[in-house]
Amino acid sequence: MNLIAILEQEEIARLTGGNAVTEFAPGDTVVVSVNVVEGTRKRVQAFEGVVIAKRNRGLNSSFIVRKISSGEAVERTFQLYSPQIAGIEVKRRGDVRRAKLYYLRSRSGKSARIKEKLVLKKAKSA
């Protein structure tokens, strides 16, 4: 491994504090908890939406979350290892066939729905 990759791995370990980052994929509905500082007050703001893209670039990894708020579409890009992100919770797994779901931008209503991925449980052998 080269020196830059080693430094990136150390920085990722420092930022995550040893905790693993929640696994999610495009199509999943997630709730991103963001630390917001307003003057001297600090609070946590939740942003819930569908992950339409994920960019895996080590320390520079990011993802885009899209939601419909009051009839208006809102997209927000988050850095995966940002200290402003308090947590990521997966609400629902989506079953999609694409890595980038940019086509959802031109769709609304029922045509913008994503099927839910059903996880099969293994049967116990008796």
Curated annotation (Swiss-Prot):
Gene3D superfamilies per the UniProt record, alphabetical: 2.30.30.790
N-terminal signal peptide: none
InterPro entries recorded: Ribosomal_bL19, Ribosomal_bL19_CS, Ribosomal_bL19_sf, Translation_prot_SH3-like_sf
Superkingdom of this protein's organism: Bacteria
GO biological process per UniProt: translation
Gene Ontology CC terms, in alphabetical order: cytosolic large ribosomal subunit
Keywords, ordered alphabetically: Ribonucleoprotein, Ribosomal protein
Pfam family, any one: Ribosomal_L19
A GO MF term: structural constituent of ribosome
HAMAP family: Ribosomal_bL19
Family: Belongs to the bacterial ribosomal protein bL19 family.
Biological function: This protein is located at the 30S-50S ribosomal subunit interface and may play a role in the structure and function of the aminoacyl-tRNA binding site.
Protein's UniProt name: Large ribosomal subunit protein bL19
Gene: rplS
